[in-house]
């Protein structure tokens, strides 16, 4: 039999009447869990700032058509009336979430965090006078709440008088008031905890239980809330029409540019001077164009994690970062080691690193001790003032000075990945068989299986900014919001191994003996490219390397001139670009992926001679080398899905920056090192800042439109893949993504309709 609990509720003249309540625990727990699972499906996960990942703001509504989802959400948000009691409930919920979820910003850690949010709330809420207002009855009620959050939800639903048929709707409404905090908790429970147990466990069941308890105390008539007044959806429908017009205009323009290039796709050139494989990121497109104009260079596009699902521990780091798309689980742990250097340099580095740790620890202790902060200010105030002056008036000089001081104290050393399987520590490294398998798959996916140049560069990317909570949003999304240079260096190291090359030759990929692979990193803020070649043991043609470096520097200059037009600067292009990366007051160091519009899966010959204006994700692909469509299948179900997340985040952050973005950076406050709030207490903002999508308050820089995917491959192959994968059916048939196929034989353009039919585009 199911066990039962009895909840004794007292009566007072000033409180709501409370009655005795009996119910079966097991049955109710299952019912509540099922309801919560249903209502949380529409909550979009929110990634923390350190690994800020673009995600569709309406991810939970993708089962609807794009138009239906937008109308439903816009109408609901605009029809929500202001309610003072609701704001009080929100304020308390923000306080509890901020305290529990904090990861090092707070001076004093919330007690009982290791037992979970609900347990911690149970223990501490009776001491929160701002919540219970020292009312004895309320304090007694708080002290006698059930131990399980599901039981608390049932208790509160009954206390609020929510009818059974309305309970799921009521829970959905409850979650919708703070979607940012709810989304972050969803990320913790569904994404962060995929690899093990969470140190401070929390779930949306806990979140709902705590919120409903607070609601019972501060807003007991919440169930009687006036229904949201549905605003006429005419404005939203007009918005959708505007988006459609932009999409039609852009598609017509893009296909018009591609049409004359169709006859050039099969033209094969001679052996290139060097080949560079860039991330598919839209910021790579103009830089690739610039470097190709300077010599006989070939560039390719591939996901910036270079096909390696790894976690990487930095040489100086104490944390391990997942350097692969969030859709994948890291399979391998990789460490770094110092490249052979003189013993004195390594010793100096280690001592300097330890000295900086001690200095930081002492500073933190003095800063947060009850008696020493004033003395700290008195002793360091003048130096802090000088630092602030330099960073404000001469940011480039200030950064250079900081770098020089760091080099004096702790000289930097070059590192290389340790990827060989460790027999003593088997969870570290990659076996030889897996090295071969991942290297082959990467080369086939990027279309680099023959005609290798003497020098092949895998170029990851990252950004360089100051005082920017959203710094990871400018890094590589395919690397989980981290910089991609280490993945590039890792794949290059694997492909330089003789044993790997021999195995690849047996599988039909013959890499010439004089071909050398190197990793590199493209700084998308300044367009600097750093090539990592110190760990390469093979002979590198120094003339080619020197010429490539000179051409990369010229490409940087040319691309800066192109980019500066969009940044509205009157200064010298290169000087202003560098200043933006060093200036701690700069709200727009770069435009990121703003204006992204299309995802092109095709050989580079199709787009090489076209100015795509930095608006296209470019993934290299040769359908003639993919008879069964497995390579295209991977491209459409992985990188294209990530591109759609990016596209929709920019789209929704533009059309409603308050609801789906994060507002102006000027009023941001970092909360618990996990996200930002507007002011001192708001929902956790979960989209892009105003400055990332708007030229100014009234004019958008990003053009909101859905992703246009263009695939150079026969329709029958594409149709088979769409039928095979539900995610593709959802995105294409619900019109979250538009798909155009270019037939390689007839050179006709076809559009995939939501009815699963193809129509010719004329």
Swiss-Prot record:
Listed binding positions for Zn(2+) are: 279, 281, 461, 476
Q: Where in the cell is it found?
A: Cell inner membrane
Cofactor dependency: Zn(2+)
Looking up InterPro entries in the UniProt record yields: DabA
Query: How does the entry describe its membrane topology?
Result: Peripheral membrane protein
GO MF entries:
zinc ion binding
Keywords, sorted A to Z = Cell inner membrane, Cell membrane, Membrane, Metal-binding, Transport, Zinc
| Gene designation | dabA
Is Iron there in the keyword field? no
Q: Which family, according to UniProt?
A: Belongs to the inorganic carbon transporter (TC 9.A.2) DabA family.
Q: Name one GO cellular component term.
A: plasma membrane
How it assembles, according to the record, is: Forms a complex with DabB.
Name of this chain's protein: Probable inorganic carbon transporter subunit DabA
Give the protein's biological function. Answer: Part of an energy-coupled inorganic carbon pump.
């Amino acid at each position: 039999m199911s066990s039962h609990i009895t909840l004794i509720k007292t009566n007072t003249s000033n409180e709501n009447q409370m009655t005795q309540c009996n119910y079966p625990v097991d049955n109710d727990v299952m019912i509540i869990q099922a309801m919560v699972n249903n209502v949380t499906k529409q909550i979009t996960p929110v990634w923390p700032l350190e690994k800020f990942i673009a995600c569709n703001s309406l991810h939970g509504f993708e089962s609807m058509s794009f138009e239906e989802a937008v109308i439903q959400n816009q109408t609901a948000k605009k029809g929500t009336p202001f309610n003072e009691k609701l704001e009080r409930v929100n304020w308390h919920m923000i306080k509890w979430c901020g305290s529990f979820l904090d990861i090092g910003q707070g001076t004093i850690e919330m007690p009982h965090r290791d037992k979970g949010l609900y347990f911690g709330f149970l223990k501490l809420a009776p001491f929160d006078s701002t919540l219970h207002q020292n009312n004895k009855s309320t304090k007694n009620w708080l002290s006698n709440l059930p131990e399980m959050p599901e039981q608390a939800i049932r208790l509160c639903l009954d206390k609020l008088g929510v009818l059974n048929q309305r309970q799921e709707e009521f829970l959905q409404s409850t979650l919708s008031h703070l979607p940012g905090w709810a989304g972050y908790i969803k990320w913790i429970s569904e994404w962060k905890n995929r690899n093990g147990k969470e140190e401070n466990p929390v779930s949306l069941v806990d979140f709902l239980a705590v919120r409903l308890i607070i609601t019972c105390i501060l807003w007991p008539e919440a169930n009687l809330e006036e229904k949201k007044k549905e605003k006429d959806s005419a404005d939203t429908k007009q918005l959708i029409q505007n988006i459609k017009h932009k999409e039609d205009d852009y598609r017509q323009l893009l296909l018009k540019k591609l049409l004359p290039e169709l006859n050039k796709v099969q033209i094969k050139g001679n052996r290139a001077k060097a080949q560079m494989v860039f991330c598919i990121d839209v910021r790579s497109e103009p830089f690739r164009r610039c470097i190709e104009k300077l010599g006989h260079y070939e560039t390719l596009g591939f996901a910036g994690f270079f096909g390696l699902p790894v976690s990487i521990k930095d040489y100086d780091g104490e944390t391990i970062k997942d350097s692969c798309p969030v859709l994948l689980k890291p399979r391998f742990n990789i460490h770094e080691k110092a490249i052979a250097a003189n013993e004195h340099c390594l010793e100096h580095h280690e001592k300097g690193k330890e000295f900086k740790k001690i200095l930081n620890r002492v500073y933190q202790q003095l800063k947060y001790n009850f008696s020493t902060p004033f003395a700290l200010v008195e002793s360091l105030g003048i130096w802090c003032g000088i630092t602030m002056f330099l960073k404000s008036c001469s940011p480039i000089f200030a950064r250079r000075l900081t770098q020089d001081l760091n080099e004096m104290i702790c000289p930097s050393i070059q590192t290389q990945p340790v990827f060989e399987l460790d027999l003593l520590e088997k969870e570290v490294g990659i076996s030889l068989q897996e090295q071969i398998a991942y290297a082959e798959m990467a080369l086939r996916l990027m279309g680099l299986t023959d005609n290798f140049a003497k020098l092949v560069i895998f170029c990851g990317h990252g950004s360089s900014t100051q005082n920017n909570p959203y710094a990871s949003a400018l890094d590589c999304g395919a690397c989980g919001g981290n910089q991609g240079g280490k993945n590039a260096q890792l794949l290059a190291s694997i492909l330089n191994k003789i044993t790997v090359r021999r195995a690849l030759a047996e599988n039909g990929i013959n890499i010439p003996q004089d071909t050398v692979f190197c990793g590199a990193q493209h700084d998308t803020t300044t367009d600097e490219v750093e090539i990592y070649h110190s760990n390469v043991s093979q002979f590198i043609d120094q003339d080619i390397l020197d010429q490539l470096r000179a051409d990369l520097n010229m490409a940087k200059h040319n691309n800066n001139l192109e980019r500066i037009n969009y940044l509205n600067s009157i200064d010298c292009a290169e000087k202003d670009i560098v200043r933006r990366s060093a200036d701690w007051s700069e709200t727009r160091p770069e435009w990121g992926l703003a204006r992204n519009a299309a995802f092109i899966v095709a050989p580079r010959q199709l787009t090489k001679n076209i100015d795509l204006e930095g608006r296209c994700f470019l993934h290299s692909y040769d359908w003639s080398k993919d008879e069964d469509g497995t390579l295209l299948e991977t491209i459409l179900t992985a990188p294209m899905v990530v591109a759609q997340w990016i596209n929709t985040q920019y789209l929704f952050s533009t059309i409603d920056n308050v609801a789906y973005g994060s507002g102006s950076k000027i009023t941001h406050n970092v909360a618990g090192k996990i996200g930002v709030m507007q002011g001192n207490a708001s929902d956790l903002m979960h989209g892009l800042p105003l400055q990332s999508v708007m030229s100014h308050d009234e004019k958008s820089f990003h053009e909101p439109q859905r992703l246009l995917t263009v695939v150079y491959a026969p329709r029958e192959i594409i149709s088979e893949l769409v039928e095979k994968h539900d995610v593709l059916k959802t995105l294409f048939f619900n019109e979250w993504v538009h798909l155009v196929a270019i037939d390689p034989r007839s050179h006709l353009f076809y559009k995939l309709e939501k009815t699963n039919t193809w129509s010719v585009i004329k």
